[in-house]
Amino acid sequence: MEQRNRLGALGYLLPLLLHSLLLFVADATFTEVPKDVTVREGDDIEMPCAFRASGATSYSLEIQWWYLKEPPRELLHELALSVPGARSKVTNKDATKISTVRVQGNDISHRLRLSAVRLQDEGVYECRVSDYSDDDTQEHKAQALLRVLSRFAPPNMQAAEAVSHIQSSGPRRHGASSAVSSNNAGAAVRTTSETSHDDKNPPPGSPPAGSGVPEAAAAAASATHTATTTAAAAAASSSASPPSGQAVLLRQRHGSGTGPGYSADPLLSLLLLALHKFLHPLLGH
């Protein structure tokens, strides 16, 4: 009976001894390492890091998070091709310590949390674990690359869009002014044509072209008619001069004033007709 109990006790002790031996022989290693991540500006991220010391004895362990300035492009490419957690090539002298955690035991873990990341946060982050189990302190490292994408378009792109918008809106304004100028030119042409057409029409009561009156009588009648018309126009303008706006309209309607002007007043037309009928027989005799 006692022999059976001893065998049973040995059966329980053997697995425990084997487990303890495995823990003692096992090397210190990372159980969780940070991974490369790409985020947008303003996002929140977490980088895990966990380490287990060799053996079951309680040791003093320390874990630190470091931020390394952005390495050269060729080193970034090399880091992207390497295995995360096994990097030890980035040793930037401008490294900045972020946090430190120290425990007494054989396991340690610490998560790095970054909130509202910025473009300047891009770079390599390193998890350093110091193992004080032996006389000589052992240091283990695991690195991860953080890439931050811009949430908005670059400023030079916005400036280029603004310049292109200004350049595209310029011809439209020029085209509108050209249209207005062409309309004004068309109106001026129409006014000139109307004026020339009005100048060609003979005044009321004037003798038709090709009549049998001699050339001398016709010239005298024309001179007398011109003088009478000028005197009547001067008297009408001195008695009641129209406003400047109406004068401009009259000039636009009857021409620039270089040729003989004819008034549209019916009384003046009747007066001119009477003078013409009175002077025509006298000049004929």
From Swiss-Prot:
Transmembrane portions of the chain: 264-284
Residue ranges of domain Ig-like V-type in the record: 29-143
SMART domains the UniProt entry points to: IG
Gene this protein is translated from: Vstm2b
Alphabetical list of SUPFAM superfamilies matching this protein: Immunoglobulin
InterPro entries in the record: Ig-like_dom, Ig-like_dom_sf, Ig-like_fold, Ig_sub, Ig_V-set, IgSF_V-set/TM_domain
PROSITE patterns attached to this UniProt entry: IG_LIKE
Claim: Thylakoid is one of the keywords in the record: no
Membrane topology: Single-pass type I membrane protein
Organism phylogeny: Eukaryota, Metazoa, Chordata, Craniata, Vertebrata
GO cellular component terms listed in the entry, alphabetical order: membrane
Superkingdom of the source species: Eukaryota
Main subcellular location of this protein, as a coarse class: membrane
Bias kind Low complexity: ranges: 176-189, 208-225
Cysteines paired by S-S bonds: 49-127
Signal peptide: 1-28
Stretches of the chain found on the membrane's Cytoplasmic side: 285
Alphabetized UniProt keyword annotations: Disulfide bond, Immunoglobulin domain, Membrane, Signal, Transmembrane, Transmembrane helix
Disordered: region residues: 160-225
Compartmental location: Membrane
Protein's recorded name: V-set and transmembrane domain-containing protein 2B
Pfam family membership, one: V-set
